[in-house]
């Protein structure tokens, strides 16, 4: 038996145990499953690295919803459009609305999304690179999805959703 424990500590431990047991027994809503998968692009160590969430567009299964998140300590970005290119062809997509801004753990996060065809990546195959250009009010942020045999994690996420 534990002795010399203050009533305050007992209360905190009891509340913690109830919280953990409540989380462990909460069922998952099936409508929330397969919401989307998230991946990164190929980025250098000191570059802003966009996070992209790929999910189905609920109103049209021929389209994917690509949500782009830009997190920066100093800047908020207005995302205007997104372009994918393999240096032979390119596909440009306008964002669907105004950019959302929030502040998470001391970081500014700018978020917007585009709708793209499910076969986007397969339509850009056949070259040594696929690049994603994000057009913002502060310039173009260019990062690779695929380059010289190296795939960004987001390419695998596209393939998971496409299957």
Regions found by a protein language model. Give the residues of each.
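An ectodomain-focused feature that recognizes extracytoplasmic/extracellular
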Residues: 25-78
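Internal interaction segment
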Residues: 90-163
């Amino acid at each position: 038996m534990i002795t010399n424990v203050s009533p305050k500590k007992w209360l905190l431990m009891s509340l913690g145990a109830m919280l953990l047991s409540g989380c462990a027994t909460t069922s998952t809503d099936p409508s929330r499953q397969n919401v989307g998968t998230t991946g990164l692009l190929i980025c250098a160590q000191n570059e802003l690295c966009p996070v992209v969430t790929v999910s189905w567009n609920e109103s049209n299964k021929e389209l994917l919803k690509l949500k782009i998140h830009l997190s920066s300590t100093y800047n908020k970005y207005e995302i205007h459009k997104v372009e994918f290119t393999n240096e032979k062809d390119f596909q440009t997509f306008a964002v669907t609305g105004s950019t959302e801004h929030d502040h998470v753990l001391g970081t500014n996060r700018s978020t917007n999304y585009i709708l793209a065809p499910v076969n986007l990546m397969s339509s850009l195959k056949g070259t040594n690179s696929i690049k994603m250009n994000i057009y913002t009010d502060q310039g173009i942020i260019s990062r690779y999805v695929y380059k010289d045999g190296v795939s960004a994690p987001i390419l695998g996420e596209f393939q998971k959703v496409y299957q």
